[in-house]
């Protein structure tokens, strides 16, 4: 559904313009209603509202007596912020979430199928280079589901 890497500028009010190639799809999919929350990798995750609602239902079913499950719910649901594309195709990135991900003027929007990741551009470039080096060096263990993947 969503793919590609798009460098974007954040304006002085903390807004980012959604690339034009995604705007129509988002209007059709969710009328421009999105949910933004934290990711454990130091970036933000941006979900179309229907995708977020599915995740939220899964999170709600996690047992509150399990400390890890409760922490996950606190982080993802507690930081969740409703966003809507304005008439110019922009969304406001709340200051608390911009601060969490270290977002300033230059960010990168990364399509991840059913959602987007939003990274500080410098952090993205460093992480991407590290991931490429890991793959080239054959480091890490692939999950069983990926062992037969070929391209």
Predicted regions and their residues:
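Beta-rich strand-turn-strand
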Residues: 81-90, 95-104
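A positional/architectural concept
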Residues: 2-44, 49-50
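C-terminal end-helix/capping segment
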Residues: 111-137
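Helix-adjacent hinge/juxtasegments
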Residues: 49-83
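Acidic/histidine-enriched, glycine/proline-rich intrinsically disordered or flexible terminal extensions
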Residues: 132-151
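Short, charged/polar, Gly/Pro-enriched secondary-structure boundary elements
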Residues: 25, 54-55, 124-128
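A short beta-strand-loop micro-motif that forms or neighbors metal/cofactor-
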Residues: 28-43, 80, 102-119
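Short, structured motif recognition centered on aromatic/hydrophobic residues
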Residues: 14-18, 47, 89-93, 97, ...
């Amino acid at each position: 559904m969503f793919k590609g890497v798009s460098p974007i500028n954040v304006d002085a009010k903390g807004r980012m313009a959604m690339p034009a190639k995604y705007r129509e799809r988002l209007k059709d999919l969710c009328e421009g209603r999105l949910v933004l929350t934290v990711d454990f990798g130091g970036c933000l995750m941006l979900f179309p509202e229907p995708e977020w609602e599915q995740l939220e239902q899964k999170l709600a079913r996690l047992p509150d007596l399990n400390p890890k499950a409760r922490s996950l719910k606190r982080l993802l649901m507690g930081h969740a912020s409703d966003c809507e594309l304005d008439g110019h195709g922009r969304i406001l990135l709340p200051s608390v979430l911009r601060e969490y991900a270290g977002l300033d003027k230059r960010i990168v929007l990364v399509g991840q199928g059913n959602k987007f990741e939003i990274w500080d551009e410098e952090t993205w470039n460093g992480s991407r280079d590290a991931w490429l080096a890991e793959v080239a060096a054959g480091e890490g263990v692939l999950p069983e589901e990926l062992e037969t993947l070929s391209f």
